[in-house]
Amino acid sequence: MSTATTTTSATTTMSVVQPRQQELLHLTSTPDITPYTRHGYLFGQKLAASMSPLLHSIVYSHLSLNWAQLRLDSPSIPLFLQLAQHPDFYGASVTMPHKVAIIPHLDHLTPECRDVGACNTLFLKTDPATGRRLYCGANTDVIGVRESFVQNVSDPARVYESRPALVIGGGGAARSAVYALHKWLGATDIYLVNRDKSEVDAVIAECTERGYGDRLVHVASVEQAEGLEGPGAIVACIPDFPPKTEKEMLVRRIVETFLMKEEKGAMLEMCYNPSPFTELGALAEHEGWQVILGTEALIWQGIEQDKYWTGRTNEELPIQQIKEVIAAKLAEASKSHTS
């Protein structure tokens, strides 16, 4: 398992709260766990299009494990905490809107989870002194960003190391991108471009509080972008919608200014739903940038999750098969979206 498994204590321990009846009404039924030896959950809301259960099913089939990740589409953290007490539960992918709210209920956090302030992975450990099951939080989104660049850029020293980076957006994915660029990818300054200044201010404040916000720069105008050194790595964390409002169009012009600078680099386009082939990605490619599809981040964060849950290494997991199945699934989804 990676060094990310080193844990630090959270402020409170895993709490079990009986779900209120009105919360249970939001969930038509809990998933059937009886066919499986062990089970986990994809816990969040609006999960129908998620490829997470598919990705993990490939791993479990390859390892001959009768395991499954089941969708738990619910607003109720108490319900999830109750289900997580089952002896055959192995862990969970945690998605929106629970990535921050789940943290106070965990026993330990990995350094990445603590520093980003969001948990997308719940895994289990055993207290050696008491034998008690410990519920631990990790953030593998940062691994997804890191490995997207490491696995796909052949000359990182030339492309992005010791150069500024650019993050487009101001949500949770942007925070993970900032962390990965700062900690592992050798970024100097990290430019932030977003339509909402308050979101950028929040990212800078949170990262500063956690010790890595001093090199963050809010780029708020085309003129400012023109005067800055061009980035080597770009992470785009916004939906694939044509800009309509004045603020959205300003963001597009600022990004175009960076893309048109003489020295190019690599852009990770985090958006892959309904298609990984986005308008922004096409623009970057036209300007001579290497574009890395967002499915790479999906795959690598998922692989890291399975390392926590199964204890296996990258070499033991079917990475190429995962890539092929996800690519085929996306091609099918893209075809239906355009037809």
Swiss-Prot record:
E.C. no: 1.1.1.24
Reactions accelerated catalytically: L-quinate + NAD(+) = 3-dehydroquinate + NADH + H(+)
Pathway the protein acts in: Aromatic compound metabolism; 3,4-dihydroxybenzoate biosynthesis; 3-dehydroquinate from D-quinate (NAD(+) route): step 1/1
GO biological process terms held by the UniProt record: 3,4-dihydroxybenzoate biosynthetic process; chorismate biosynthetic process; quinate metabolic process; shikimate metabolic process
Pfam families, per the entry: Shikimate_dh_N
Induction: Expression is induced in the presence of quinic acid. The quinic acid (qa) gene cluster is subject to two levels of gene control: a primary system which responds to the presence of quinic acid via the qa-1S repressor protein that blocks the qa-1F activator, and a secondary system which represses transcription of qa genes in the presence of a preferred carbon source such as glucose.
Keyword NAD: yes
Keyword Metal-binding annotated: no
EC top class named in words: oxidoreductase
Molecular functions per Gene Ontology: quinate 3-dehydrogenase (NAD+) activity; shikimate 3-dehydrogenase (NADP+) activity
Record SUPFAM superfamilies: Aminoacid dehydrogenase-like, N-terminal domain, NAD(P)-binding Rossmann-fold domains
Highest taxon listed in the record's lineage: Eukaryota
Keywords: NAD, Oxidoreductase, Quinate metabolism
PANTHER family, alphabetized: BIFUNCTIONAL 3-DEHYDROQUINATE DEHYDRATASE_SHIKIMATE DEHYDROGENASE, CHLOROPLASTIC, SHIKIMATE DEHYDROGENASE
Function: Quinate dehydrogenase; part of the qa gene cluster that mediates the catabolism of quinic acid (QA) and as such, allows the use of QA as a sole carbon source. Catalyzes the first reaction in the inducible quinic acid catabolic pathway by converting quinate into 3-dehydroquinate. The qa cluster encodes 3 inducible enymes (qa-2, qa-3 and qa-4) catalyzing the first three reactions in the catabolism of quinic acid to protocatechuic acid (also known as 3,4-Dihydroxybenzoic acid).
Name assigned to this protein: Quinate dehydrogenase
Organism: Neurospora crassa (strain ATCC 24698 / 74-OR23-1A / CBS 708.71 / DSM 1257 / FGSC 987)
Organism lineage string: Eukaryota, Fungi, Dikarya, Ascomycota, Pezizomycotina
Gene: qa-3
